[in-house]
Amino acid sequence: MKLTKYLILSAALVLAAGCAEQKKASTIGADANLEARVERLLSKMTLAEKIGQMNQVSAGGDVSQYADAIRNGQVGSILNEVDPVKINEFQRLSVEETRLGIPLLVGRDVIHGFHTVFPIPLGLAATFDPALVEEGARIAAIEATAQGVRWTFSPMLDIARDPRWGRIAEGSGEDTYLDARMAEAMVYGYQGREADTTSMAACVKHFVGYGAAEGGRDYNSTFLTERQLRNFYLPPFEAAIKAGAMTLMTSFNDNDGVPSTGNTFVVKDILRGEWGFDGLVVTDWNSMGEMINHGFGEDRMDVAEKAANAGVDMDMMTFGFLSHLEELVKEGAVKEKTIDNAVRNILRVKFMLGLFEHPYVDVEAAKAVQYTPEHLAAARRTAEESAILLKNNGILPLKGKGCILVTDPMADAPWDQLGTWCFDGEKEHTVTPLKALQERFPGQVTYVPGLRYSREKRERFDDVVAAARGADVVLAFLGEEAILSGEAHCLADLNLIGSQSELLAALKSTGKPVVATILAGRPLTIERDLPNCDAVLYSFHPGTMGGPALANLLSGEVNPSGKTPITFLRTVGQAPLYYNHNMTGRPYQGETLLADIEPEAGQTSLGNTSYYLDYGAYPLFPFGYGLSYTNFEYSNLSLDKEEYSSYETIAVTFTLANTGDYKGTEVAQVYVRDLVGSLTRPVKELKCFERVELAPGESRNITLQIPVQDLAFWGLDGIRKVEPGQFQLWVAGDSASGEPVSFSVR
């Protein structure tokens, strides 16, 4: 996908830019044509200068560490520096003390907010609200670019079906369609619908299949076929590229034996060849060097050659390009035109961001855009929409003036509340649930710490249980610390860690109603805890304003509307379990569980169907699930036609009614099943969703449009197309509900 949407802006920046900030950059010329500017600069560069642009270094700390390398034209990008004073100095070195004055591209992991931290991406996906997610990404870009960060290594688009994998927190869950919609939203948010000096280049990652790591262990191998890649794992990346994503990152994993950073098929053939991507491709941290560990290359020279010829433009922290590309070009192992094309892609991004015209930032002005009331309000709204009500026996919303006991370990954990992969959030600005509840219910809240952190043992249980006996309701804030999810933080046991389940049981033994609010980076296995809870509100680490959001939800000021973006397992032994699995030859038709088997039973296949003897076939909560304080009813589902051609659009009409007592928002979800195909097809696939707000007693007729082309898949013949035949379609509040209607495609 050609990066043309920012061309007009490039011209505008050139015309508007003053000379004070440019100095040597002004020698490049003020040509409004982006490609002409790129070619003009490229033609002036020596081979060594070109290779320098392909080198990225981690420059956090002392500016002098890389000052000489920058002066010598050996650095094209830095990461891990957010101090605007230092960034300005790095830029000054590059713009004013190098021959061509090419500015640096400054990168940072701005994953779910910069200073104002939003819910982790798995929580963002739980909103099913792309517009709100785009707003959050726009705020992150405004805050980060004000300090000189013009490139974020986000969004992560790895489909993840195994909650043991720590980085499940950083993505949008298990569904391809939802992931694609979130990808588009974050790209639009980071880069802006129209580029300006607050545009921060998005970097979609990790290309590709990283989330399918075998056994849920980070960095592990993946074994995905081409059809699996094309039907499930690649579409979110393609959607992000079509939305204008400027950059892409390769992944750590090897798929079917080929490490991503040296995978010509996915990078050069699909990304570059089929999709026409002319943006910047960067390695993940030392993933070029790690190809040596994979056994895919002998040394840094070998893997540098493989990465360059696969279509990688920039090396993050291996220094393989810097050390060996010039020699590889002389030997003919890498063509100079390959280097030229890589540098074109790098320069193109720098021009599109306006870095040649605006390499510096206003240090004082940067402070004014952090933690603004508008940003904090958006973070609160997002945290509200991301929370999922999993159980409610009528105890929520909180009523009356009674005594509320609040207990740990997540009630007053300002750092852990921010979630994983959060480098610039500050716990001093975090509003915790305890603080927010004390403000919401003045004089009613008693706080008794039970566990200081999620892994602590039960030394203080007696104090908490005694306090519970005197309370009218117990609010237990449970979950996992931020450090327990994220990169390299995988778990084999997904139960509430430490003594938290024991704490819940002890609280329930008092006979008082217990509300569990769980803050975590993944879907934990909480089946054993449900009997000890009268209500469960699940919040994937909610960020800076998680406290006010949860207080609003628990009090009924806001009605929960979040939906599960990932299947919640009954036990870790079910992993991976996901809703859009293929139909088997022996689909589920009932089960015989362990308790049903007689002693010395004769050998039998116990029903000839697909399930576990101890845990059955179904998850604890399916994809798309989430309760409300009100009730929603679906009716009158119909389609505008019974048969469609492959280029028509299906009009799906249904009635949604709020039959309860509270105003609420329902996420109406449309699922489709292809009954017969040239390949076995998923039992259901999400094809559309819509957030609908209804007042008590209100009903609304809703029509959603689904292009028939959205039913296409990559088949045996290596072509993506819609196959004619019979289909079923559901509209429901989750992936396991509703009655289908039928249609056909000719």
Model regions: which residues?
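Short glycine/proline-enriched turn or capping motifs at secondary-structure junctions
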Residues: 6, 736-739
